């Protein structure tokens, strides 16, 4: 099981050309890295330091950082990654990479958001995406009856924040987090739309799940690897402290970032089931993070005619497809808007994972298997031979 470069909503740098076939990031057998790891379009003088030991508290990373006074603006990670991000020059990064407690130092990448491509509401009684995932075949029957609501499950949206006052979320918004301080208020709208698809009363798959907003992107939709890791880190600690059944959605991504992939893996190991957007470049999803994480659920996008979206990424890192073209969901400030992208497909899977958890509580591998094994096979048009032909299905078999 396995990002989204949101062709429609997120625009990230393309990965560098390589003759090496792209492969998933396997949490069970991660790559051995050392020295300074390069990324595409790095932020000057910004690095992420990953320690050799497992996550165990911020004091460990802080003690390592303290030995290098040339590292400034230090932010430590405690739960999903053992390490810290900091500002330093290349020589300091190389020196820290040689420290006996350091596994590797990674350049920090940048993420930027582009203008959304919007569609028009069909004013259907049931959004077509919900209608499609509770039946095996077309035509749509204008109903959504999945047989579960996701009650008792907690859903975390790692994104631009949330309009918590939208009536679609009334009474179900739990504690959130923002890397910018204060409440995770959505200044863009993307996170609100995504959350509406996961768990909104009107547009949501799991209509009674509890919602947690995790803001890692600013109001322009811009973020960094370290800010996204901070979000994953917070989710991991919050879930450990509370012990409740959890799904998380990441409708974001960019070029390969081993540190981010490692953080997602550690969060999965802590009990969080992740759904991740595959990306919208019509390229191989294994070239992006965190869509290449094998143990997460990575979603491509399809339309209401069961055709794959022309923008959707492809390849073996995709687990299955979900509705991602002209998807109606909650809008910041109230009402709804219609958007397209694998950003829209992924939350359908996060909601379906919440339904699986509500029916049969279990660890992330069992939840992911519930989602993938229950998918409708060989019903989509335009799927390449290197990509699974599976369509999300939300009902219990």
Positions of predicted regions on the chain:
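The feature captures the short pre-catalytic strand/loop hairpin that immediately precedes
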Residues: 303, 322-349, 378-379
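C-terminal motif of bacterial Sec signal peptides marking the signal peptidase cleavage site
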Residues: 14-16
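Active-site glycine-centered loops adjacent to acidic/histidine catalytic or metal-binding residues
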Residues: 159, 279, 341
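C-terminal subdomain of the subtilisin-like protease fold in secreted/lumenal serine endopeptidases
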Residues: 34-37, 73-75, 209, 213, ...
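Structural recognition of the beta-strand scaffold that forms the well-ordered cores
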Residues: 48-50, 85, 154-157, 196, ...
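Subtilisin-like serine protease catalytic core
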Residues: 125-126, 142-175, 182-227, 241-247, ...
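Protease zymogen maturation seam
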Residues: 18-40, 63-76, 81, 98-154, ...
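Short pre-catalytic strand/loop immediately N-terminal to key active-site residues, enriched for Gly-Thr
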Residues: 178-189, 308, 332-344
